[in-house]
Amino acid sequence: MKKIKLLLCVLLAVVLLAVGCGGQGGQGGEAPAGLPEGFVYLAEAVPDVILEIRYYSSYNFLGTRVDDYLVPVAIISSEAAAALAVAEANLRAQGYVVKVFDAYRPQGAVDHFVRWAEDHGDVLTKAYFYPDLAKDRLFPEGYIAERSGHSRGSTIDLTIVDMQTGKELDMGTPFDFFGTASHHGSDLVDAEQTANRLILRAAMEGAGFVAYEEEWWHYTLAGEPYPDTYFDFVVR
C-alpha cells in the first residue's frame, strides 16, 4: 500500500510538471488560447478521459442546452487536472476509464439553472431527474443555488466506465438525479451500486479530491486554487 501511495505521489508530481511546462496554463506557463491563466482543457491535460458534456446537449435536467456552453469541452484548473490524472491512472490500472459530465461551469450557466428552477410550469424532465420532488422544492432543499462551486474551476462531475464492456458502472441513479438516492451512503441503492461508488470515491480522494456527500458524481479539489473566485468566461 505504501508503495502504491508513493507511486501515485510521484505520478502527481510528474503530471504537475508537465502541465506547468507544457503551456497548459499552470504557474510558469501560458494558458491555452481563449482560457484564463491557470485553466486547461481537460482533454489535453488528461487525454484518456471520455467527455460527455451534458450541459452542451439536451440530455440534462433542463432538457435543453445550457447557456454559455458553446462547445462540448471540459475546462478545469491546472491543479485539478493534474490531480485527476492521478485518479485516472489509478482507475485505469483497475480496468476503468473516467467519463466526465461537467467541470468548470460559467456563472451564466448557473443563472440559466436558476431561471429554469423558478419556472414551476416547466416539468419536462421531472420523471427522470426529480420524480420524488416538487419543482418548487429544488431551491429550498439545495439542489439548485445561485452560485456553484463548479464556477471556481476545480470541481468535476464524473463517473467510471468498464474498459472491457464499454459501459458505465451502475451507480444507482443517473448523473444529476435530485434525490436522496444520489447521496453517498444512501440505503436506496444496493450493495453493488454502493461498491461502485466507493471505487470512484477511493480513487478521487486518493488523488486529493473531496466528495460532496449529496452527489456521488461530484468532487472538488482540496486546497483548490481559486476558493473565493466565481468565474464567468464561456465554455468554448
Regions found by a protein language model. Give the residues of each.
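Extracytoplasmic cell-surface/polysaccharide-interacting catalytic and binding patches
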Residues: 22-103, 107-214, 223-236
